[in-house]
């Protein structure tokens, strides 16, 4: 009798943890963005800011998928995490609506690259018969990071301040590398 292959390797768990940290990083700032943007004098741009981030994330996925196939999964995952790390650290330094829009563009791009490369890498390291199960497991970590991130962000903003919350968001992205 053949032993069934497990998807639960160290590499798989590290990818799940990385995706959790990455998703918590970019989602923890979401509830604080409207007030922060308003403090920069850009309350009327809140809808555009959210749309720009989401649109950039979506549009960058096909390109990041091709890039992932061309140069490899790990470099693209690292690129997405590094861009997210830099963006998180720059938010407290931005003092204009235009700068904020540009930053949200790049931050959105990072969320189109990292998860795409991570999903491809999971498919590479998991036996074909277990890929659906593995993608489901990865999805749980992704959804958990995205759902707990805003709670963490609001808590940090309340207890430590917005600047510190942005820096901790940046730290989460760094740890996701």
Predicted segments with their positions:
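Symmetry-related core transmembrane helices of the 12-TM Major Facilitator Superfamily/SLC fold
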Residues: 165-177
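Paired small-residue
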Residues: 98-106
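Helix-breaking motifs and short loop linkers at transmembrane-helix boundaries and internal kinks
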Residues: 72, 93-98
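Cytoplasmic helix-loop-helix junction between adjacent transmembrane helices
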Residues: 105-142
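Helix-loop boundary and gating motifs at the non-cytosolic
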Residues: 8-48
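C-terminal ends and interior cores of transmembrane alpha-helices
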Residues: 82-95
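Residue-level signature of mid-helix packing/kink "hotspots" within the transmembrane helices
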Residues: 54-62, 146-147
